[in-house]
Design a protein with these regions (language model features):
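Glycosyltransferase catalytic domains, chiefly GT-A lineage
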Residues: 1-136
Length: 136
């Protein structure tokens, strides 16, 4: 089974519908798991209240590994789980990527051609002792 996972709050609900539609009709996904902030377990929210208090990323994107892990645990070996941000959409079927997945290497991660400094505040680099050009 090919499963698409996405997440949206009310602000991104409409654009997520494009993600889900292209997931089914372009990417050939068998199932789309659409999650919202209301789908996060209250005990998980309570355990991480200091993170979920931030509006940015609906709790600094902590929901992302939460839902991916949830889908992994709910499905069986051999299923393909594809996470795509709700603002993204499919222009072709990603099945060609599946050939890179093996039992030894079950994950395929894409990167974007940007530097970490495009996403990280300079103070974070200083705090971590990583404020050199070769790391940023």
């Amino acid at each position: 089974m090919n499963i698409l996972v996405n997440f949206a709050d009310e602000k991104y609900k409409q654009v997520r519908s494009i993600n889900s539609w292209t997931g089914i009709h372009v990417a050939g996904m068998d199932l789309v798991k659409e999650y919202t902030p209301e789908d996060i377990d209250s005990s998980f929210k309570n355990d991480n209240v200091n993170i979920f208090k931030y509006k940015r990323g609906c709790g600094l994107w902590l929901w992302k590994p939460y839902f991916i892990n949830k889908v992994i645990n709910e499905n069986k070996d051999g299923d393909y789980i594809f996470y795509c941000d709700s603002g993204g959409f499919f222009i072709r079927n990603p099945k060609a990527l599946y050939e890179y997945l093996t039992d030894e290497q079950p994950l395929f991660v894409c990167d974007i051609p940007l530097l970490e400094s495009c996403f990280t505040k300079p103070e974070c680099f200083k705090i971590m002792g990583c404020d050199t050009d070769n790391i940023k």
